[in-house]
């Protein structure tokens, strides 16, 4: 009985960690989910974006004190405009999704919301990390050797 209690406590103390994708694994997943060429954005640009926004980490979050919003998940999708975290003042929730859904290891919801973001007039330029690290650069290295 004592061993079962200890085992239960050990299992409760295990923290759930987000998935950190390997570069080519992410490229294959994004391609499978329809991002390659979506709204004219190459797969290499999406992988570059994810690298610089989250380090390929599905559980990445970043609080923005200026507007009290938070960026979520592999694409760092913002709670001010795109998802609902129940805390951001004046949030729009244009993706009609809970921000916590953007932190899942299965990135289908994050991809669906990213498709919504890139469909706006600003397109992929909505992401600062893409503008700073991927725009007007050779991003082919992000899919090199991935067979995609």
UniProtKB/Swiss-Prot annotation:
Signal sequence extent: 1-18
Pfam families: Lys
Primary residence: secreted
Record field: catalytic activity: Hydrolysis of (1->4)-beta-linkages between N-acetylmuramic acid and N-acetyl-D-glucosamine residues in a peptidoglycan and between N-acetyl-D-glucosamine residues in chitodextrins
GO molecular function term, any single one: lysozyme activity
CDD domains: LYZ_C (cd16897)
Annotated function: Lysozymes have primarily a bacteriolytic function; those in tissues and body fluids are associated with the monocyte-macrophage system and enhance the activity of immunoagents.
Family of this protein: Belongs to the glycosyl hydrolase 22 family.
Name listed for the protein in its UniProt record: Lysozyme C
